Amino acid sequence: MIDRPNDALTLTLPDGSTRTVPYGTLPRDVVASIGAGLLRAALAVEVNGTVQDLVTPLRTGGTFRVLTERDAKALDVLRHSAAHVLATAVRRLRPQAKIGFGPAIEDGFYYDFEVDEPFTPEDLAAFEAEMRKVVAEKYPFVREEVNRQEAERRFVDDPLKLERLAELGDDEIISVYTDGPFVDLCRGPHVPDTSRIKHFKLMHTAPAYWRGDERRQQLQRIYGTAWFTKEELDAYLHRLEEARRRDHRVLGKELDLFSTDQRVGAGLILWHPRGAIVRNEIETFERELILRHGYELVYTPHVVNEKLFEISGHLVNFAENMFGPIEVEGTNYRPKPMNCPGHICIYQSHQRSYRDLPLRFAEFGTVYRYERSGVLHGMLRVRGFTQDDAHVFCTPEQVPEEIARLLELVDEMLTVFGYPYTIELSTRPENALGTPEVWERAERTLAQVLEARGQAYTIDAGGGAFYGPKLDFKLIDAIGRKWQGPTVQLDFNLPERFGLEYIGADNAAHRPVMLHRVLVGSMERFVGGLIEHYAGAFPLWLAPEQLRVIPITDEVRDAAAAVAARAKEAGLRVLLDDRAQTLNYRIAEAERLKTPYMAVIGKREVEAGTVALREHRLGRTQKPQILGVDELLARLTHEVATRALPGAHGPAAGSGAQAAAD
């Protein structure tokens, strides 16, 4: 509840004590009353879950927490402030540059500028040096609240700012921040002064359309990163270098996994034979898993009468992400962006009884979503992708058990791929369908199931889908990055919109609850993420080529061919490399393609009935293992059958892969 100007505000501190202060008190005064040392360390505060800086007047009471460098939420404040320091530096060196906006983003910040010529690497170096001068000058971030006329006067030479001002409602507070001579239209929050921004680096520049609209002017966006310590900055730069080494677009080409072709269309993936093997293995594994968990497979069309999406609400709430209509015989059809309406139609094809529930429909369904060309990114951001969609139709009483089953399914799936994960509970967005009461009930149900299982989670306020709250699983890859993973969504709205029913034990009609879930989500994105997670060196069960048999000389070729034939009969994907190339060349070729195992066979191995086994993961300097052919095949087939992670030579470690919540 927003307090009135004449109200006293009650603030509850983390230790349970309270402070009563007048409306409009500055947070820094509250922090000072707690302790001078805390004030020196304070960067911002959090009031009722909302972060604000130390100079924004308090307008509401509630929980009050001081943010210091030790708090993850303070990092966004630091980075937003670094964006302002960047704009200050650019304005000093390029006074004619028109300023856009500069938010904090994951791992850093950016700022948009309208300039006559694109920025160069030399420009970035000069801007970064100037930023260090601004930091050294220790300018305080001074906040002012101004009326519209004063704001327009201050930004008369900045048309991008004037455009934003024109959109603000009459009752909105207009605030500006200055650091030294630079002034910016901004809501904050900011750190107390520029000297707090010590460890930063400008990364690169790229064109960006104003407000992401390709019909608008193109700006120059400068990206940067900022951290509280030099060690954190250095570690981040190292991760970036490692990420470049793992880039799925580069590895996808080197390993011949996938490609795109402008003749096919932007954002549409062509799966090559080697990539198709990886995808097929994942789908086969997941199909076995979900059938064991009680799902039934279904298929729905790629193109659907758009009236179905009017009923579902997608045409109103998701239209900008849908492809345009295709008119056929007076009826408009759309490439489907979602599989759920089709599954609902299957549910409604029969009268359902409570004895039929829960019903669990699953589909590897290809969907199509419009993305601007500027945001397309390899396999990670595409326009057509296959989604492992499933929908559970159940009674309200069955919801907790079904969610618990889904959590077990997700954990079993992710453990096989070696992903730790965190869970976010995403709550009601602004464009939500349904009443707040329905949403609160759904959110409470998800939270209660997580808490009953002892699973840690964080809240992503406003991050739910328009038809229901969801659990988002964030996968943590080998270099610590987070990826979008499985989702579980609780939906009371679509059953209402479609009029779904089942006949209860009382012989009356009742409304079922619908659960949406994906495990890998977009198959394209998941495989792209796996390529980077494994750096292209897939576990044996996923590897396009599992074993390469290499005869040292022509004299042992037939014996090597016999080993390759036995491996193929055992179900392994094997290649016999008997080319007239040197042994080192052929080993290097297998290493380049990240083939997990190489069986090198010479005269000595033929006589002993053995192979010299090399593992890709052990590198070029390893000493080969001498194994009998039977032992080799037993080991590799066991590793495939158990879907072992590299180096395990057995089943993947058990469940419990959830990482600590942030």
Where are each of the predicted segments found?
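NTP/phosphate- and nucleic-acid-binding module
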Residues: M1-G100, E106, D112-D662
